[in-house]
Every structure is written in structure tokens, then in C-alpha cells.
């Protein structure tokens, strides 16, 4: 694996010798990498290679999976998130996640975004500002400002996904994980989400799982290629796509297998 982050101060997430098992099946094998701050890191690889399992390790979503066992370290700003004193609720607030299919709550647009701040104790008088700022950051406010009390499910698929991003932003995370966020969307909605992700990296560290090679090339600064639970190669996206060091990386990128 190629080390690309020379300056430790640039590193936001450090993963050291991460192994994960579902029962007897090992899904991740000795994964180590450093994810730079305020960047977009794309994870690519064939279905079942471990990339979605990996990002769920970054906010301990795999804790919810029966018979899941993890070894190794995940450090966020030098704190081991698998330490015994870690508040997992606070961790998931700081490391937000947007899933493959939009999953708005069955409530109004406004209440979807206000939900997280409310349960985390944000003062009622501040909620309006939080909601509006989150919707603006997700490039959705102009489209919804006159119907914030309308059902979230009345939005289009692309708008629903941006609403889910706004909901994530409303609790002020430091890191945002995206698990194939555009795979269920049309090309126009996909382009808007991609533009949004590239804009958000100014304020957040972003890790995205994608099966879309062109998408990874368009929006990411760094790319990791997973195969059979192993991180085969990690580097700057330009290097991975134009001069990969590993033959399996080249074969995957050029479509020889998938």
C-alpha cells in the first residue's frame, strides 16, 4: 500500500491493522491507511470487497451487527474510537453517514433537519437558524424555503438525498461518510450531489464508497482500491487512475473485472 500523507498534521483519520470478522468470515484484512483532512477520499472495488464494511468501522456502525468482531485501531484526531471510554452516540454525531437510498423520516422537511439538533439539546430559539443553514449548505434551501412544513416524502429522489445530507450537517459533524449516495439517482441529481460533495470538503473530511469509476475520478482527491477484504492500493486519485502500482488495480479500473 502506498503512503501518501507525509505531514501528520494533515491526517484526520488513521487506520492501523484493521481486521473484521462476521462470525467466522473475515471481511477486512489488515487494512491500514491515513485519510487526509478536508479532502474527498473515494473507496472503489467490486461488490463484496469490504469497502462498505470499512466505512462502517469509521463510526462504529458495525457494532450493531450480530457476531461482528473487530481488531486494530481507528484513530480520529489521535483518539481511538474503539476505546472503552468512547461515547458512541457522540461519535456518530461527529462522523455522519449518508446511505445509498434516501431515507427521510416520515415528517416534514423542517422536522427532518431539526430532529438531530433537538435530540442533542440545541436551544429551541436556535433551531430555525440551524435548519436553514443546513439546508443552504446542502443546496436545498432555495427549493424548499416556501414549503418547509411539507412532507419530506413529497420531494424528488435527488432532493430527498440532499435533505438527508442537510440532516447530517445539522448536528455539525467533522467527517461525513457517503455509501454510494447517487446509485439510486438520475444523472442530473447525481451531478448536483457530486457538486455538493466537492463544495463540502472545505469544511468536512469526506469518505465516499462508489461503484462508479468516473465518479471517483471526478470528485475525489484520494482513492483506495479494495479487493477481497484487502486494501490493495491507496494514493492520490490521479496516480491511482493513470499509473496504478498494482496490476489488479489497473485491471479493475480498465474494466477487466468488476
UniProtKB/Swiss-Prot annotation:
Its main location: membrane. Its EC number is 7.3.2.1. The keyword Translocase applies. Coiled coil: none annotated. It catalyses: phosphate(out) + ATP + H2O = ADP + 2 phosphate(in) + H(+). SMART domains: AAA (SM00382). Residues 13-253 form the ABC transporter domain. SUPFAM superfamilies: P-loop containing nucleoside triphosphate hydrolases. It comes from the Archaea. GO terms for biological process: phosphate ion transmembrane transport. ATP binds at residues 45-52. It is found in: Cell membrane. It is a peripheral membrane protein. Pfam families: ABC_tran. Part of the ABC transporter complex PstSACB involved in phosphate import. Responsible for energy coupling to the transport system. Belongs to the ABC transporter superfamily. Phosphate importer (TC 3.A.1.7) family. This is Phosphate import ATP-binding protein PstB. It comes from Methanosarcina mazei (strain ATCC BAA-159 / DSM 3647 / Goe1 / Go1 / JCM 11833 / OCM 88).
Amino acid at each position: 500500500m502506498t503512503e501518501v500523507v507525509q505531514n501528520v498534521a494533515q491526517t484526520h483519520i488513521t487506520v492501523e491493522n484493521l481486521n473484521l470478522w462476521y462470525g467466522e468470515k473475515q471481511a477486512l484484512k489488515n487494512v491500514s491507511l491515513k485519510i487526509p483532512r478536508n479532502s474527498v477520499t473515494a473507496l472503489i472495488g467490486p461488490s463484496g470487497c469490504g469497502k462498505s464494511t470499512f466505512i462502517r468501522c469509521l463510526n462504529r456502525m458495525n457494532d450493531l451487527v450480530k457476531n461482528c468482531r473487530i481488531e486494530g485501531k481507528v484513530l480520529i484526531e489521535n483518539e481511538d474510537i474503539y476505546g472503552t471510554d468512547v461515547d458512541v452516540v457522540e461519535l456518530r454525531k461527529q462522523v455522519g453517514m449518508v446511505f445509498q437510498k434516501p431515507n427521510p423520516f416520515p415528517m416534514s422537511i423542517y422536522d427532518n433537519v431539526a430532529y438531530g439538533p433537538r435530540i442533542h439539546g440545541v436551544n429551541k430559539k436556535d433551531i430555525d437558524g440551524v435548519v436553514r443553514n443546513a439546508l443552504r449548505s446542502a443546496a436545498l434551501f432555495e427549493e424548499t424555503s416556501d414549503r418547509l412544513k411539507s412532507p419530506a416524502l413529497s420531494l424528488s429522489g435527488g432532493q430527498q438525498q440532499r435533505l438527508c445530507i442537510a440532516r447530517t450537517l445539522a448536528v455539525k459533524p467533522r467527517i461525513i461518510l457517503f455509501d454510494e449516495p447517487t446509485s439510486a439517482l438520475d444523472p442530473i441529481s447525481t451531478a448536483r450531489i457530486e457538486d455538493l460533495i466537492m463544495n463540502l470538503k472545505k469544511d468536512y473530511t469526506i469518505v465516499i464508497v462508489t461503484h462508479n469509476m468516473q465518479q471517483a475520478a471526478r470528485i475525489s482527491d484520494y482513492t483506495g482500491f479494495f479487493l477481497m477484504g484487502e486494501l490493495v492500493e491507496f494514493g492520490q486519485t490521479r496516480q491511482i487512475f493513470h499509473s496504478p502500482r498494482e496490476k489488479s488495480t489497473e485491471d479493475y479500473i480498465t474494466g477487466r473485472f468488476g
